[in-house]
Amino acid sequence: MKAPLLLGLLLLSVTVQGKVFERCDLARTLKRLGLAGFKGVSLANWMCLAKWESDYNTKATNYNPGSRSTDYGIFQINSRYWCNDGKTPRAVNSCHIPCSDLLKDDITQAVACAKRVVSDPNGIRAWVAWRAHCENQDVSQYVRNCGV
């Protein structure tokens, strides 16, 4: 009786954790999905952003009580402006996707939405973590020895 319960709890924890990318695996994936140089933003800057926003975790979420919105996924894309989570007041959903799409292990939709975000006038500066940890920094370490 205890073994099936333990197995069930183990599987649940794996499901909730999602995929945590290895650094170079994420760098190769982002390059393949066209983020390297998109809107003038280097792959190293995207990697720095993903490191500080989610620690490369596809299932990362962060609730913002002030705006009653939530940041979702590897890029921590916000439900106020970019996706629909069904609970954020006055959500815009500029990426035209459910926020749950940003939590998938396949980050194709997250990358497409990140491209939409960075295409706005604020560009990469839309992300607080990028401004705090990546702007005007040597971000080459995030792609070092990845062959990208």
UniProtKB/Swiss-Prot annotation:
**Which residues belong to the signal peptide in this entry?**
1-18
Q: Name one GO cellular component term.
A: extracellular region
Which Enzyme Commission number(s) are listed?
Answer: 3.2.1.17
Keyword set for this entry? Antimicrobial, Bacteriolytic enzyme, Disulfide bond, Glycosidase, Hydrolase, Secreted, Signal
Domain of life according to the entry: Eukaryota
S-S bridge residues:
C24-C146, C48-C134, C83-C99, C95-C113
Q: Which reaction does it catalyse?
A: Hydrolysis of (1->4)-beta-linkages between N-acetylmuramic acid and N-acetyl-D-glucosamine residues in a peptidoglycan and between N-acetyl-D-glucosamine residues in chitodextrins
Q: Which residues form the active site?
A: E53, D71
- List the InterPro entries: Glyco_hydro_22, Glyco_hydro_22_CS, Glyco_hydro_22_lys, Lysozyme-like_dom_sf
Q: Give the location in the cell.
A: Secreted
Per its UniProt record, what Gene3D superfamilies does this chain match?
Answer: 1.10.530.10
Among the Pfam families in the record, one is Lys
A Gene Ontology BP annotation from the UniProt entry: defense response to Gram-negative bacterium
- GO MF: lysozyme activity
Question: Which residues are in the C-type lysozyme domain?
Answer: 19-148
Q: How does it assemble?
A: Monomer.
As for family, the record states: Belongs to the glycosyl hydrolase 22 family.
The note filed under miscellaneous reads: Lysozyme C is capable of both hydrolysis and transglycosylation; it also shows a slight esterase activity. It acts rapidly on both peptide-substituted and unsubstituted peptidoglycan, and slowly on chitin oligosaccharides.
Its function?
Lysozymes have primarily a bacteriolytic function; those in tissues and body fluids are associated with the monocyte-macrophage system and enhance the activity of immunoagents.
According to UniProt, the name of this protein is Lysozyme C
